[in-house]
Amino acid sequence: MVKKAHSFRRKTRGKLSKHPRRRGLPPLTRFLQEFEVGQKVHIVIEPSYHKGMPDPRFHGRTGTVVGKRGDAYIVQITDGGKVKTFFIHPVHLRPQKG
């Protein structure tokens, strides 16, 4: 029997893959995004940049910006009945519209 892998990126072939035309790093404006405290943001993982990447199970979730630490933003998400706090690089965040 082979041991089961429990790595960070397991079972993410579809979630963390890019189409060939979208390969490489995103534009610099995505790295330099600014968010306000209290602003709602969506977690959309950028697979080509690994720093400040949240766990893939939170891809697509919406949270609230609570503060900033270094280049990363402190984002709170409700998971079930629990409030969880993440330090996420802005390249993995998109502002909520509307």
Swiss-Prot record:
The residue ranges flagged as biased composition, category Basic residues, are: 1-24
Question: Pfam families from the entry?
Answer: Ribosomal_L21e (PF01157)
Q: Which UniProt keywords apply?
A: Ribonucleoprotein, Ribosomal protein
| InterPro entries reported in the protein's UniProt record | Ribosomal_eL21 (IPR001147), Ribosomal_eL21_arc (IPR022856), Ribosomal_eL21_CS (IPR018259), Ribosomal_eL21_sf (IPR036948), Translation_prot_SH3-like_sf (IPR008991)
Q: Which GO terms describe its molecular function?
A: structural constituent of ribosome
The Gene Ontology biological process terms listed for this entry are: translation
Q: Which Gene3D superfamilies match?
A: Ribosomal protein L21 (2.30.30.70)
Q: Which Gene Ontology terms of cellular component type are present? A: cytosolic large ribosomal subunit
| Region named Disordered | 1-27
Family, per the entry? Belongs to the eukaryotic ribosomal protein eL21 family.
Subunit relationships: Part of the 50S ribosomal subunit.
Q: State the HAMAP family in the record.
A: Ribosomal_eL21
Q: Supply the name of the protein.
A: Large ribosomal subunit protein eL21
